[in-house]
């Protein structure tokens, strides 16, 4: 599994008088997953985009302020666990407005291809 650099924490919620941001933790239980992550500025410009391939047993921490999607890139069903704080709220308005993440994952005969979503310019 590829490693991710931890970005600086960005406040997303308040908890017990302290500023707290919330990551998510995923574990792949079965199948082969491609986690697509993106972080955008307040105007919607993509600051960072990552693709992380994970197999059974791999764990991935999604940093706060990253939009993410999980794609099954294998031939068997994909099963994963997601640990997230109940106080966490996700906002995917920009992703819906742009018809997906900044990159699409397309199936090919011998795997997959990642292509840019033209809605992000």
What are these regions (language model features)?
Residues 34, 58-60, 64-69:
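Histidine-centered metal-chelating micro-motifs
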Residues 1-54, 71-121:
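Active-site region of the double-stranded beta-helix
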